Amino acid sequence: MSEQFQHVSVLLHESIDGLAIKPDGIYIDGTFGRGGHSRQILSRLGENGRLYSIDRDPQAIAEAKTITDPRFNIIHGPFSGLKGYVEELGLVGQIDGVLLDLGVSSPQLDDADRGFSFMKDGPLDMRMDPTSGMPVSQWLLTADVEDITWVIREFGEDKHAWRIAKGIVAYRDNEENEPLTRTGQLAKLISDVAPKNFKEKKHPATRTFQAFRIYINSELDEIDTALNGALDVFAEGGRLSVISFHSLEDRMVKHFIRKESRGPQVPHGIPLTENQIKALGSAKMKPIGKAIKPTVNEVDVNVRSRSSVLRIAERL
């Protein structure tokens, strides 16, 4: 791996500590990336421990194949398939920990050819797996103003969503313009249509690029499916350790842990028999500590860690 595409794992020790590694345990790293968390898990496992890592990025799979440790296996696919992979392995109810490091990795951002960054010109792609699905440039060929506005507002939480969407469609529909196929084009277009008094510290294109990436990769659906899948495969006492990088992700994780730690909520005044109450079940998880954020030192070393949040929970 070239120096340009090196990846510094965020909240590395805190997230692995949160898994409370058992030497002979079975663990899943749902987001292999460049293997920082996976290698740390392996360093804490005994000779009978096992680690199954997952990633849908072919470049991540290539990196994973350089690991020859017999305790390690890599699965090429989205982490939303976690439950299915565990079922195929016959390990339901035996998983001692699941780690999810959400969002886009530094190597993906730094590689202009992947199209994730507005800071570097490249193909307007943004797919986590470039071998499947639709690149952003293809989606923008036919998406209307309402659809684009909804995506930017829903996944980018940008108050200028309508203005940006109108600018994109106006540019696209002008036959004198070059096709919108490059990240540099999109970043400039957004800067041009942003209000002249735009005062945010971030680049005007930040939220739109985030929104398009989340949408094109169905990231929030992936997270929801993975969290619920993990719940179904844990052994008693199994740990969930999740690192989020923006408010949409963190809210999902926070609400999931809260919901599963409260158990079924029955409205007051509804008469239930003892058997009916038992059938509803009880809380399935408990939160471990409070949300953890990177230290000042970590942010100084790796500025991309500044927005990260780690949440840990345990299966009951």
UniProtKB/Swiss-Prot annotation:
Pfam families recorded: Methyltransf_5
Signal peptide span: none
Q: Which GO terms describe its molecular function?
A: rRNA (cytosine-N4-)-methyltransferase activity
Keywords recorded for this protein, A-Z: Cytoplasm, Methyltransferase, rRNA processing, S-adenosyl-L-methionine, Transferase
Q: Name its cellular compartments.
A: Cytoplasm
Q: Does the keyword Secreted apply?
A: no
SUPFAM superfamilies linked: Putative methyltransferase TM0872, insert domain, S-adenosyl-L-methionine-dependent methyltransferases
Q: Where does S-adenosyl-L-methionine bind?
A: 35-37, 55, 79, 101, 108
Q: Which GO terms describe its cellular component?
A: cytoplasm
Output the HAMAP family linked to this UniProt entry: 16SrRNA_methyltr_H (MF_01007)
Role = Specifically methylates the N4 position of cytidine in position 1402 (C1402) of 16S rRNA.
Protein name from the UniProt record: Ribosomal RNA small subunit methyltransferase H
Q: Which gene encodes it?
A: rsmH
